[in-house]
Amino acid sequence: MADFKGMNGMIALKRVALICVSLVLAGLAGCSSSSTHIAYVTLPTSNSIAAFRVSNHSGKFTSVVGSPFAGGNSPNSIVLDPANKFAYAANQTGNDISLFMIDSSTGGISEVMPRTRAGISPVALAMDSAGAFLFAANVSSSDISVYSINAGTGVLTEVSGSPFPTSAGASPVALTVSPSGKYLYVASSTLGLVFGYSIGSGTGVLQQVPDSPFTVGSGPFSVAVDPAEHFVYVANSLSDTISVLSLDSSTGMLTSLPNSPFTAGTNPVSMAIDSAGKFLYVANLGGNNVSAFSLDSTTGVPTELTTPKSPFAAGTRPIFATIDSTGKFLYVANENSRDISGFNIDSSTGGLTNGSIAASVGSAPTSVATTTK
């Protein structure tokens, strides 16, 4: 795989691949939520987080007053609570997590001290849809930190038993919570595995599901679950493939599809699935483009679009992809060109158009997060 120079390179890329461009969409009172939302972008090399007001109509980015905002040491992943009151950023070199209050009038953010301890080199965050628990992948300590979230203050409290182990040398770089909030899936960048955990109801305690971990391709760098919770998709950055596994909703167990893995672009590192579960978008770090696939709702098989023809050009070294809450736009964070590409999504065909630069951010972005409408 071009441009990946050992694990250090992979981790540095995850900062880019975890480009938590936390797109805070709609739902911000006083922000004319019917016409705009807010996007938050992590900029680890400048220890800051950029914020933009985004048009729901055109997808145009306009910098929020005061942006970029000071963050922790190398913030590379950001998520928002469902009420859009709080933002959380994983600080890779600080080994901690920052909590920010979101100003509902301006979209600005202010950090609440002290920061919360994490494992060694937290590089990815995920939250359940209820906003009850926050999960952090610690790449250097090969474990998962789990926190309960105070709905009133946003303060994090580590749950009993946290951090939870993966395997020695697993180097987890990506994780996602299933839509039901019952399961957590974690990608091991070094072992070619996905770990599956059940999430204790009310406790957040993790327990590996039967037969976990599950074998995927080489260098898994992103993991996603379809909205119906039938399939798990994994972007394998070193083998240029996408693994697809069926999900047993009663146990959380995964079973690889017969013809999996499927051919992808060059160095796929980030994925986004539309809310209807019809289309899958994959940022290809080495190809400087985005691949688009239609998804068979029955079999889970991805088929790359031919009309319009995939892949679609992005910026230089696209590391993160996300769909905004309107479902109309795909935003891609580009590491080397230091910008965000914006695409219009055709809801009928899944095709992408425009692809122009929505915003220049000055330093390498590493993740995008969006609010719910």
Regions found by a protein language model. Name each.
Residues 4-20:
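Bacterial N-terminal signal peptides that target proteins for export
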Residues 19-27:
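Bacterial N-terminal signal peptides
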Residues 27-373:
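Predominantly soluble domains enriched in secretory-pathway, periplasmic, or organellar proteins
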